[in-house]
Amino acid sequence: MKKLVFGLLAIVLFGCGLYIYHVWFGDPFSKNAAEQKLVSYVKQTYPKKEIKITNGVYNAKTSEYVFEATSQSHRYPMCTKGFLHPKVTCDGIEEAYTESVAKHVNEEATKAIEADLKKAVPRFIKADAALSIENGQFTLDTKWNKKLAEKAPMSMTIQLDASGLSKTDAAKMAETVRKTLNEKGYTYSNGTIDCMQKDGDGGIGYVKYSIDFLSKAAIQSNDAEELGS
């Protein structure tokens, strides 16, 4: 009887040990299934690219296997999650492409905004537009137009020269920016206007007033937060 009890206890302890090991370090069967899943995935998703899946490691925090996808000396993270039927949970190749697309679209949007604001605001310095673009939403062939911001929310940061201006004057100038953006038909979720104080050499010194704004709310003097003087 004692041998049976000790035998069952040993089996239970062994099973618990395997489970704990799997939770923290994964196991060769799951790792192989994850690797095969990624090999199949990249062949189907990127049939024209030669991609090698290597260096798989187990991430205990996310319960994922993280591999390296190597293509033309570039390395990208690829992740899977699941035991018998793993699913792809991250695609570094697609994410890198989306970052390139976002950079392209944001640069074009910024150029358009700067061109419009330079004409309307004499003390305009620069703008920086950022669209929240999801994977597969646009491509590198996508050309900027204002309707894109209806699909991908756009925020922006704008710098104005507020040297020698009071908070009230800075707010009025910022309101001109808001009105101009609206008149030109820009759609945006929110924006920040940094009213700058130039230094003694004429360079950009520091943020004198900072103003957060929305398209439908007029900017008042009390919206300007004084940061430096």
From Swiss-Prot:
InterPro entries assigned to the protein according to its UniProt record, in alphabetical order: YfjL_C (IPR056905)
**A Pfam family matched in the record:** YfjL_C
Report the superkingdom from the record: Bacteria
Q: What is this protein called?
A: Uncharacterized protein YfjL
Supply the gene name: yfjL
